[in-house]
Amino acid sequence: MEGWQRAFVLHSRPWSETSLMLDVFTEESGRVRLVAKGARSKRSTLKGALQPFTPLLLRFGGRGEVKTLRSAEAVSLALPLSGITLYSGLYINELLSRVLEYETRFSELFFDYLHCIQSLAGATGTPEPALRRFELALLGHLGYGVNFTHCAGSGEPVDGTMTYRYREEKGFIASVVIDNKTFTGRQLKALNAREFPDADTLRAAKRFTRMALKPYLGGKPLKSRELFRQFMPKRTVKTHYE
């Protein structure tokens, strides 16, 4: 793949005294691992561009699992993330690194990612709605199809006044039992619309996406959450990550 592709760096680390190993998300090739030779040298013009949240054009090639970066250009300055929006951006980057296979095309997800970080950059309040929409979009692209509009047991449309319990691989079934797997019909309608008008629907969306993403993430904790807990005020941590 030698043509130019739109891309974002998800993560980078030193590979040698002068090179970087990059985990990138591209429009056409999906997630790709690249070696950026010479990117750490003092004379390199790439070092400043190969950063998370900077829209890039990349050209790369090679036959193995690890490709070689041929050229890179920053399309614009990095999207301005700071504080809680920066940690939110690091979270979605880590999420993609954990759940996406290498070199599997996700062109629509690429634009969902772009829209998410643009929303984070422009956020004046909580970043949670943008995060929940992205998580739901990611689950959809991974093939995790869930029907939020109809009861999996009866086939009847979801009633906003009723309670439904989530069952993996089946969907939501009307239930009188209330536990961490139950959702109100109103909450399910909010999930389906990807609109979260209040704290109740946001909490429900977080609860569902945590539950649905767990099989993809396994038991290994996300480093971005740990960083968030270390460096952000406790009240903010509880509000956004608990």
UniProtKB/Swiss-Prot annotation:
Give any Gene Ontology cellular component: bacterial nucleoid
Q: Which SUPFAM superfamilies match?
A: ArfGap/RecO-like zinc finger, Nucleic acid-binding proteins
The answer to whether UniProt assigns keyword Cell membrane to this entry is no
The cross-references to HAMAP family, in alphabetical order and at most eight, read: RecO (MF_00201)
GO biological process per UniProt = DNA recombination; double-strand break repair
Task: Identify the coding gene.
Answer: recO
- Function comment: Involved in DNA repair and RecF pathway recombination.
Keyword annotations from UniProtKB, A to Z: DNA damage, DNA recombination, DNA repair
Q: Know the name of this protein?
A: DNA repair protein RecO
InterPro entries, alphabetized: ARFGAP/RecO (IPR037278), DNA_rep/recomb_RecO_N (IPR022572), NA-bd_OB-fold (IPR012340), RecO (IPR003717), RecO_C (IPR042242)
Gene3D superfamilies attached to this UniProt entry: Nucleic acid-binding proteins (2.40.50.140), Recombination protein O, C-terminal domain (1.20.1440.120)
Quote the subunit structure annotation.
Monomer.
PANTHER family, per database record: DNA REPAIR PROTEIN RECO (PTHR33991:SF1)
One Pfam entry name: RecO_N
Q: Which family does it belong to?
A: Belongs to the RecO family.
